[in-house]
From Swiss-Prot:
Gene this protein is translated from: Arhgef18
UniProt biased composition (Basic and acidic residues): 92-103, 308-330, 1396-1405
Gene Ontology biological process terms in this record: actin cytoskeleton organization; regulation of cell shape; small GTPase-mediated signal transduction
Comp. bias intervals (Pro residues): 1355-1365
Keywords for this protein: Cell membrane, Coiled coil, Cytoplasm, Cytoskeleton, Guanine-nucleotide releasing factor, Membrane, Metal-binding, Phosphoprotein, Zinc, Zinc-finger
Full protein name: Rho guanine nucleotide exchange factor 18
Low complexity compositional bias, start-end: 1375-1394
Coiled coil start-end: 1084-1181
Keyword Coiled coil in record: yes
Pfam families: PH_16, RhoGEF
Subcellular localization(s) per the UniProt record: Cytoplasm; Cytoplasm, Cytoskeleton; Cell membrane; Apical cell membrane
Positions carrying Phosphoserine: 961, 1336, 1338
Subunit organization: Interacts with SEPT9; interaction may inhibit GEF activity. Interacts with Gbetagamma subunits GNB1 and GNG2. Interacts with EPB41L4B. Interacts with PATJ (via C-terminus).
Length: 1405
């Protein structure tokens, strides 16, 4: 099928299939409006729902359907009978209407309702060709209503509709006569999915760029004819709706169809989706139209799933191979010729997988064919994350210049236009895309695939979160806790290093490669975004490989997972030291310095270049990128170097101290920190340079600053070998007191004061002071009483200047002062050399030329001196020739006064040679002296020497005159020498003692002189040698003189240069130098004062420390004394505890003894009770036999011993204050109350249990009226009474002599008891007042019920034997206990009151 845009048709969705021309201008109405309106409403609702969920934008290129089977099969057969009102439209009419409606759309589209929809699921035309191909073999097998109705819905060509309808409908499905169908309410004249010709509008949509794509050349728009009375069955309408829905899905329709359905059916070669729809054909025929929406949705869902699977399985290579297999020619299937469309390369149909050919596709230009005016293609909408390739959009050709489309009629124009205006605005916000398949091609690139495999393989090795999870669980549990922590940190180091390498690979191999290949970025532009990325990747890849190797070295045998890295420090030291460390330092400095520039450049490109933006979005969809954008990558690489110290410190914390690895790790940590510090310094320096460039760029070109010496400082001078130290806002105070805001820029040698004016920096001017301050001789001082102010004093030679500057805070002031002072110290000493380079250069050149002139003059004089010396030597030689001596061959070579200065200035060597010659001369003279002595002995006569000149060569005079042509040697050797010739040299005044060494070249002897064997020839040889020696010595001395002259010249030159420098220094020693020296002296004094203050503080600190030590010693002594006292007290407490233990032991012993005595007392008490009972029985017996009144008191007194002993019953104590009781039961009760069982806690006698005769009389005080006074008064009346009857009866019995042995025993016991009672009464009398007080404190305790306080169990009542023991004997711990009387256990007052009735019966004491 072709790619030409077809005349616009509304979207062929379910709503379009069910819609009619109800809203059009035509007069035609459906015969069954209720039935089809229901279908329309249901389909419209489904369409609106689908539109709200749609997020993509695809459109149907109707021009691409021209020449296809969809349109060609509509022209088969003869035209059917048409209604008399049908309208035939030719292609020219379509084109004219399209042009008119295009302008109408652009004017009224803003107010239209959103009826045109967009679907982002486009389908290629090649796939559509396969799907729409007709198979002749299947034509006769049955009707295929969806296929034929779809074709009819697109185009109806004249009378061919009738023939097509009659031939395509099955026999069983032949419709009834039209008159019959028209009258039936269940029939309808035509479907709402097929448009009437008069209702067809040729509206054209305005594109984003107001350009339209031309249809394919050679294809004419089809002639659309509408039918009035033909109609189909309702179930056929449903199938038509399904096919139209498929057509919209396959071609991404952007329009809504408002057409009427038409009858007919034909066989077609169905695709998978058509087969699914036809499989439910039987069910669709009996279903109601309301179910069409559900069928449509199920088919759409199935289509989406299949499409996604087909899109996933396609690769670019596979698609490329298929493009070669598909012929680009027409196919003739079932009598229909289908035209292949042309598509862009490597594009494929997402449904069938077939590649699209050539240059254009529906998906590539989803809106080009719809939103254009025919001149140029419109930019397509951004489909998802699809990124366009390079290049512009290729226009799609159109035969007529504008696409003719099916669209709404005039009544729906506004609504349709508004939708497309909205789509246009949406497209303006998105980027234009050139190829929808560019992304898939790039993703499936083999290079990207291999890179993804490489990155995934690296990530797979470190996919576990920690070392504990990467090794076997049992192996991890066997390790110590410290080992596990260390291995976890090492694993984290390797894992983060692998992530860092992955980030660098993405930067270099994804982004950088894409920029170079896709956008043709230069290497410099890429390096600006990713500086030094390749070097960093190389270094870190090597580091990661070393870490993996170290991990491999420590793998357990037989395992590929379990490992414990024992040593890692050497790898870290190797990575961060040496050449690798320097390289890392350099590269990270460059990368970190360019961080801000890279981010700024990226943002700028992202804003200005749509191609760059598209490429970044495209790369962002890659799976290997994983949300790592350019900024994220740059930031991660910048921060990576700062992560190493943290990891290494954690490794050190879990490493045993003192080991070799611990030392290596510590060294690696120091190296890493050093690298980071240097990188920070480089980054800071780079940032300062960038800031200086920004300031210079912002500075006004015309602005300049005048210096004190008159020179000018301009904008260009800022960047001339100057660095920025500090910049910030200051306030410059004028003489009037006003503050002016300035920007202070501290450079290497100057301080600039700028101010902002019209967004430009200009040199500030306050009080006509120069805004450029030289740092040479600059003095910085604080302002008194001003924390934020400082003085800048420029001690220049041209005149000092003082600036008063203010900062925002004291801290800023101190920072500025410190930076300025450091800059002054590091500033060159030459004053203002940077400002007067030209003048200084001229002065230096003049000085140099002058010194060179002096040097030339001195050299000339040295040459003259050397020449004079040479001439002088020549004279000497001539004189020697006159004397007949031969000239030496090396005479002229010995003196080099006129040679190279490097050879002449060898004074030391010349002097040594001269000394050697002198020594040789001395030895020769000695030898000659010996020879002349021997000759004098032989001849016997001494001849005097010839006269000589002092300054000649040895003063030698020869008798023979030398010939002119002979030499000095020859003449000497051939002449007749006389003995007196040897005397001259011996007495020569020029001979002096010297060294023994002589150079070999200075004393050459002739062969004749050396080989003379006779003694006569010896003086001649010595004479010749002596002459040579003297001549050589003369030459050496002359050379030394020349050297000395030259050295004098050099010395003078140096002295002159020194004097020149001193002069310059003296010229610079002006007032500025004095001020600077004063400032230095002041600073020195200030430092000395500060040092003195520090020393004073140190002395105070030492004194405080000494005082503190003394105080501490004193406190220590006090603590020692307190400790000693505490120990003493502890000893005393220990002794007291021992004494207490002893006393407690003694008391325990006494208590045990007391208990023993108490038991004895109780036994005795029980015995007394038994005796008392017996005596009571005896008394009763006596009472019965004795008359009470006949007995006199004496008898009673004698019978007293028979009564109870008072010491046992306690009645003696009561006898003084209470009357005697009656004998009988009362006495037994009293004895029972004082029995041994009640000794410790005596019981109080009950009032109602007492016998009537023992109760008190009425005359006594009642119980409720008892008081302390009554008790005291009753107790004071203590008297002893003896009943007369008892006394009489006792006396009578005595007189009768009826005493027995028992009565005698009772008498003796009674007398003993009486004595004991008397003693006890004495003791009781002493404590009577105390006992009264105790009884008076309890007024509510009556005499009848109250009893004395219970005696302590530890102190029983006294036994009869120790009755006389005083109370003081019972003491515990020095505390006396109150004595307990026997009467304290008995009731007092009630018993005494009741006994008054029977005084005769009982005797009381």
């Amino acid at each position: 099928m072709g790619s030409e845009p077809k005349p616009y048709a509304q979207p062929l969705d379910s709503a379009a299939a069910a819609s009619t021309t109800k809203g059009s201008c035509g007069p035609r109405k459906p015969e069954n409006p209720d039935f089809f309106s229901t279908v329309e409403d249901e389909q419209e609702d489904g369409f609106l729902r689908h539109l709200s969920e749609s997020t993509e934008d695809f459109s149907l290129d109707m021009g691409a359907l021209q020449g296809s089977e969809y349109l060609r099969d509509l022209g088969l057969g003869a035209p059917s009978d048409l209604h008399q009102s049908e309208v035939i439209m030719d292609p020219e009419t379509h084109r004219q209407e399209a042009r008119r409606e295009s302008s109408h759309t652009s004017c009224e589209g803003a107010s239209a309702l959103p009826q045109r929809r967009s679907w982002e699921r486009s389908r290629s035309c090649s796939g559509s060709c396969r799907r729409l191909s007709l198979d002749a073999s299947t034509v006769d097998k049955g009707a295929c209503l969806p296929r034929t109705l779809a074709s009819l819905a697109l185009n109806l060509s004249g009378n061919g509709q009738k023939i097509w309808t009659q031939g395509c409908l099955p026999v069983s499905g032949t419709p009834a006569p039209s008159s019959k169908e028209c009258s039936s309410p269940e029939k309808r004249l035509r479907s709402k999915s097929v448009p009437v010709s008069c209702e067809i509008s040729c509206m054209e949509l305005a594109s984003d760029s107001d350009v339209c794509t031309s249809p394919v050349q050679g294809l004419e728009p089809p002639v659309l004819e509408c039918l009035e009375k033909d109609h189909v069955e309702p179930e056929h309408v449903l199938i038509v709706q399904q096919v139209l829905q498929e057509l919209r899905q396959y071609h991404g329709a952007r329009q809504r169809a408002r057409m009427s359905t038409s009858p007919g059916g034909a066989h077609s070669n169905l695709t998978w989706f058509e087969f699914l729809s036809e499989s439910e054909d039987g069910a669709c025929k009996i279903e109601k139209p309301g179910k069409s929406t559900r069928v449509k949705r199920s088919l759409s869902s199935l289509r989406s799933r299949v499409t996604r699977q087909k899109e996933k399985g396609k690769s670019p290579a596979h698609l490329k191979d298929k493009t070669q297999d598909l012929p680009g020619k027409r196919e003739c299937v079932n009598g229909h010729q289908l035209m292949r469309g042309t598509f862009s390369g490597h594009s494929s149909c997402p449904l069938c997988g077939e590649p699209l050919l050539n240059s254009a596709s529906l998906k590539e230009h989803p809106r080009t064919t719809l939103l254009s005016d025919g001149s140029s293609p419109a930019p397509s909408r951004n489909v998802g994350m699809t990124i366009s390739q390079k290049g512009g959009l290729q226009p799609t050709p159109s035969p007529a210049g504008s696409g003719v489309r099916l669209g709404p009629i005039a009544g729906d124009m506004d609504e349709a236009d508004s939708v497309f205006l909205k789509l246009k605005q949406t497209a303006d916000d998105s980027l234009s895309l050139t190829s929808s398949n560019a992304e898939s091609v790039f993703i499936e690139d083999p290079y990207i695939a291999s890179l993804r495999c490489e990155i995934e393989s690296d990530a797979h090795e470190f996919e576990a979160e920690s070392w504990s999870l990467s090794v076997d669980l049992a192996y991890a549990k066997k390790q110590k806790k410290e080992v596990v922590k260390r291995q976890d940190v090492l694993y984290e180091l390797m894992q983060t290093e692998a992530h860092h390498v992955r980030t660098l690979k993405i930067m270099l191999k994804v982004y950088s490669r894409a920029l170079q290949e896709e956008l043709q970025f230069s290497g410099q532009a890429v390096s600006r975004l990713f500086p030094c990325a390749d070097d960093l990747l190389d270094m870190h890849s090597h580091f990661l490989a070393r870490l993996k190797e170290r991990r491999q070295e420590f793998l357990e045998e037989g395992s590929d997972r379990n490992y414990v890295i024992q040593k890692i420090g050497d790898v870290l030291v190797q990575q961060f030291s040496g050449e690798t460390g320097e390289r890392m330092k350099e590269k990270y400095a460059v990368f970190c310095s360019g961080h801000n520039d890279a981010v700024g450049q990226y943002k700028l490109l992202l804003q200005q270049s749509k191609k760059f933006q598209n490429l970044i979005k495209k790369i962002g969809n890659f799976s290997i990128v994983r949300r790592l954008g350019v900024q994220e990558c740059i930031l991660l690489v910048t921060q990576r170097i700062t992560k190493y110290p943290v990891l290494v410190e954690r490794i050190i914390q879990n490493t045993e101290a003192g080991t070799e690895d611990y030392k290596d790790l510590s060294q690696a940590l120091s190296l890493i920190k050093d690298i980071i510090s240097q990188v920070d310094a480089k980054v800071s320096e780079y940032e300062k340079d960038q800031r200086l460039k920004e300031i210079a760029a912002k500075t006004d070109q015309k602005s300049s600053g005048k210096l004190k010496n008159g020179l000018t400082f301009r904008k260009e001078d800022m960047l001339q070998q100057r660095q920025l130290h500090l910049e910030g806002a200051l306030c410059w105070k004028s003489t009037s007191g006003r503050l002016k805001d300035v920007l202070a820029v501290l450079l290497t040698d100057v301080l600039l004061l700028l101010q902002e004016k019209d967004q430009k920096y200009v040199f500030a001017s306050v009080d006509s002071k120069p805004p450029v301050i030289s740092l040479q001789k600059l003095i910085v001082r604080e302002v008194a009483n001003e924390e934020k102010a400082m003085f800048l004093i420029s001690a220049s030679m041209q005149g000092p200047e003082m600036y008063e500057m203010y900062t925002s805070s004291k801290e800023d002031r101190n920072i500025w002062m410190a930076h300025i002072r450091r800059a002054v110290e590091s500033c060159p000493d030459e004053e203002e050399d940077v400002f007067s380079e030209a003048e200084e250069k001229k002065i230096a050149e003049a000085r140099t030329m002058k010194l060179q002139e002096f040097q030339e003059r001195l050299s000339l004089k040295d040459q003259l001196i050397a020449q004079s010396l040479l001439e002088k030597q020549q004279i000497y030689l001539e004189m020697a020739q006159l004397s007949g001596l031969e000239e030496s061959a090396q005479n002229r070579g010995l003196f080099r006064g006129g040679g190279d200065p490097s050879e002449t200035l060898r004074g030391e060597q010349i002097l040594r040679s001269a000394m050697s010659e002198i020594e040789g001369i001395q030895s020769l003279i000695c030898q000659r002296h010996l020879g002349s002595t021997s000759s004098q002995v032989e001849e016997g006569s001494v001849s005097a020497g010839l006269p000589r000149r002092a300054e000649t060569f040895g003063g030698y005079d020869s008798v023979g005159s030398p010939s002119k042509g002979g030499s000095f040697k020859r003449k000497v050797s051939n002449s007749d020498l006389r003995p007196q010739d040897w005397q001259g040299p011996a007495s020569s005044p020029d001979s002096r003692p010297c060294d023994n060494s002589a150079p070999s070249g200075c004393c050459e002897e002739s062969p004749q002189a050396v080989e003379m064997p006779s003694t006569e020839s010896l003086p001649t040889v010595l004479e010749l040698e002596l002459v040579h020696r003297v001549q050589t010595l003369s030459q050496l001395l002359l050379s030394l003189q020349a050297v000395i002259a030259q050295q004098d010249s050099y010395v003078e030159m140096q002295r002159t240069a020194i004097q020149e420098r001193e002069k310059q220094f003296r010229l610079q020693s002006t007032r500025g130098n004095l001020l600077l020296e004063q400032e230095r002296q002041r600073n020195f004094e200030k430092q000395r004062e500060e040092r003195a203050g520090v020393e004073k503080l140190q002395s105070q600190l030492r004194q405080e420390q000494q005082r503190w030590e003394r105080e501490r010693a004193r406190q220590q002594q006090e603590l020692e004394l307190a400790g000693a006292r505490l120990q003493e007290r502890e000893g005393e407490a220990r002794q007291m505890r021992q004494r207490l233990d002893q006393e407690r032991t003694e008391l325990e012993r006494q208590r045990q003894a007391y208990q023993h005595d108490l038991e004895r007392l109780r036994e005795a008490q029980r015995a007394v009770d038994r005796e008392r009972e017996r005596l009571e029985l005896l008394r009763r017996f006596k009472k019965q036999n004795t008359v009470p009144g006949a007995l006199p008191p004496e008898v009673l007194a004698e019978a007293q011993p028979a009564s109870h002993p008072p010491s046992f019953n306690g009645d003696g104590l009561e006898g003084h204050s209470a009357p005697a009781k009656a004998p009988g039961t009362q006495g037994s009760a009293m004895l029972h109350g004082t029995g041994p069982d009640n000794v410790e806690r005596p019981e109080v006698a009950r009032w109602d249990s007492a016998p009537p005769e023992s109760r008190p009389a009425k005359s006594d005080v009642p119980i409720q009226l008892l008081s302390a006074t009554n008790q005291i008064q009753r107790q004071t009346a203590v008297q002893q009474q003896i009943p007369t009857k008892l006394a009489a009866s006792t006396k009578g019995g005595k007189e009768k002599g009826s005493k027995s042995r028992g009565s005698q025993r009772w008498e003796s016991s009674a007398s003993f008891d009486l004595k004991q009672q008397l003693l006890l009464s004495k003791f009781i009398g002493k404590d009577e007042s105390a006992s009264r007080n105790r009884r008076s404190l309890s007024p509510v305790l009556p005499a009848a019920h109250g009893s004395a306080p219970a005696s302590d169990p530890c102190f029983p009542a006294p036994s009869p034997a120790p009755a006389a023991t005083p109370p003081e004997a019972f003491k515990f711990g020095g505390t006396s206990l109150p004595p307990v009387s026997p009467a304290s256990s008995l009731p007092t007052t009630p018993l005494a009151t009741t006994d008054e009735v029977s005084k005769e019966d009982v005797i009381f004491f």
